[in-house]
């Protein structure tokens, strides 16, 4: 609209000025000065229009953000919740059931198993069987509708959520990276982590080599959701973050499913280091991913 109005205004001024010059009411120099001034005003007016559009977009985004922030959490600490104390890292699912809605068909029903400290438990089965749902119940992303889940004998619904999630690391198929530097993305694994600790975690995750090859190294910005990195690079940064967090319980949700063969081999080597000494629940479709598991559960 501003472009059209501006064009009409300039055209009208030129036409009027030409008519007045022809009638001897204005000098040509006056017309040139006036038109030049008008043209110089076009860009600032356009900038104001652009600024208004950006402001409106920002206000709409703020409204969505505030709506999200004001949404009450469905899963909160229960009265009297205590901090989780992990001594060994044994995980027990006892007759666990879950449905996404009250009247919905149960996604899980009567699931019971024990993952002893340091064991790797593989969860396999067709898509939609509830494998990802099963591991998402452990950090209480969802709340089990029946049964109990315990860590070292402590029911997770009776412990503080922050302490529970500090004890669990998750590496999923889609790595969550922020539009920040590589060092900052790895550092999210542990508050106040030193640069040296971040670099050690990256080396353990087989990420240091490709990071050092980047122009800015650990200070390279990864872009929104890590879109400046390949899938394998994103996964190794996510693994480095889990290495840095050093939680006793590890959840792997198809962490290598979307990778090519070369990237998968690099990531799998890093995952084997990450699993060492940790109680691990693995969701996978490839048999190569679960061949070293202590127990394979079919859903």
Annotated model-derived regions:
Residues 67, 74, 187:
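Conserved E/DxxT/N motif and adjacent residues on the DHp alpha2 helix
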Residues 77-78, 82-299:
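ABC-type nucleotide-binding domain
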Residues 9-16, 43, 60, 206:
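Transmembrane alpha-helix boundary/anchor motif
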Residues 15-19, 63, 254:
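Transmembrane alpha-helix boundary and packing residues in multipass membrane permease domains
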Residues 7, 33-44:
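Small-residue-enriched core segments of transmembrane alpha-helices in multipass membrane transport
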Residues 6-13, 57, 194, 248, ...:
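Residue-level signal for transmembrane alpha-helical positions in Major Facilitator Superfamily
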Residues 1-33, 55:
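A hydrophobic transmembrane-helix motif
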